[in-house]
């Protein structure tokens, strides 16, 4: 490997930070604010150059949007039967409707139906900062090291979960804040059942919190609904189904969720 690629070498050897994706997302979100600040504060030659660059970017974006809209408006090609000219083999399918367009439209429609099917009760939730989520744990003989973190929210860990050795465990999930069951409400039947949690599907705060199994408001969890006796159209018993947490478990001490049907 060349000498100047030491950063790539370090990434391959040690990997990235645990919060790399979150930092990248925040950096990208700040870009708009930085551009706005530059547009307001830059003066003179630098201001002119910046305005020229932004103008070129906006023109390119408008052209791209216009081209995309034009491609949507174009339908099937007109048949050329009246011309009386013989067509080569590779142009014979021009008379038929554009199959690729039809397939694309059907895929989009299916996605919309799927999104409607799995629409959640809480589409937006409050963001949680890392300072609120993690508590710094001081370690070492003189308590000067602070690389350990303890999660302050309720979490879910699987059945066969075992903690890492104490000296290697970076993130601690306290036993007192672990949840195994949830109060799940069926929206159509109007009944609430105490069901075991199978796993955490998606935490809206961060992919890292999903991996750690953190249970916060708006989290999608998978619960065991075999007790409800739900069956599929084929007659098979439904084992697991998704539900969304509607309360704040760290305040209430329990997990309340609504089944996604």
Swiss-Prot record:
The name this protein goes by in its record: Ribosome biogenesis protein NSA2
Extent of motif Nuclear localization signal 1: 11-18
Domain of life per record: Eukaryota
Gene name in the database record: NSA2
Keywords: Nucleus, Ribonucleoprotein, Ribosome biogenesis, rRNA processing
Localization per record: Nucleus, Nucleolus
Keyword Nucleus tagged: yes
Renumbered residue ranges of the record's region Disordered: 1-39
Subunit relationships: Component of the pre-66S ribosomal particle. Interacts with NOP7 and RRP1. Interacts with RSA4 (via WD repeats).
GO cellular component, one term: preribosome, large subunit precursor
Similarity comment text for this entry: Belongs to the eukaryotic ribosomal protein eS8 family. Ribosome biogenesis protein NSA2 subfamily.
GO biological process, one term: maturation of 5.8S rRNA
Record function comment: Involved in the biogenesis of the 60S ribosomal subunit. May play a part in the quality control of pre-60S particles.
Gene3D superfamilies referenced in this protein's UniProt entry, alphabetically: 2.40.10.310
One Pfam family of this chain: Ribosomal_S8e
UniProt short sequence motif Nuclear localization signal 2, positions renumbered to this chain: 51-58
Presence of keyword rRNA processing: yes
Biased composition (Basic and acidic residues): 18-39
């Amino acid at each position: 490997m060349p000498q100047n690629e030491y950063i790539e070498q370090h990434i391959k050897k040690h990997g990235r930070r645990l919060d790399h994706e979150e930092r990248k997302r925040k950096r990208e979100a700040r870009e708009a604010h930085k551009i706005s600040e530059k547009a307001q504060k830059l003066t003179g030659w630098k201001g002119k150059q910046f305005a020229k660059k932004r103008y070129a970017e906006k023109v390119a974006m408008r052209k791209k949007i216009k081209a995309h809209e034009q491609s949507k408006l174009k339908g099937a090609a007109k048949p050329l039967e009246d011309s009386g000219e013989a067509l080569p083999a590779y142009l014979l399918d021009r008379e038929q409707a554009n199959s690729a367009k039809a397939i694309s439209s059907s895929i989009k429609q299916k996605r919309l139906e799927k999104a409607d099917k799995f629409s959640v009760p809480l589409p937006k939730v409050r963001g949680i900062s890392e300072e609120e989520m993690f508590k710094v744990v001081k370690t070492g003989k003189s308590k000067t090291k602070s690389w350990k973190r303890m999660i302050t929210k309720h979490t879910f860990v699987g059945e066969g979960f075992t903690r890492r050795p104490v000296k290697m465990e970076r993130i601690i999930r306290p036993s007192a804040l672990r949840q195994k069951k949830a109060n799940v409400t069926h929206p159509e039947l109007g009944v609430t059942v105490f069901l075991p949690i199978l796993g955490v599907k998606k935490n809206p705060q961060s992919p890292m919190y999903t991996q750690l199994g953190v249970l916060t408001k708006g989290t999608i969890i998978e619960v065991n609904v075999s007790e409800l006796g739900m069956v599929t159209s084929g007659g098979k018993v439904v084992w697991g189904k998704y539900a969304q947490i509607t309360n704040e478990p760290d305040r209430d001490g329990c997990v309340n969720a609504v089944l996604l049907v």
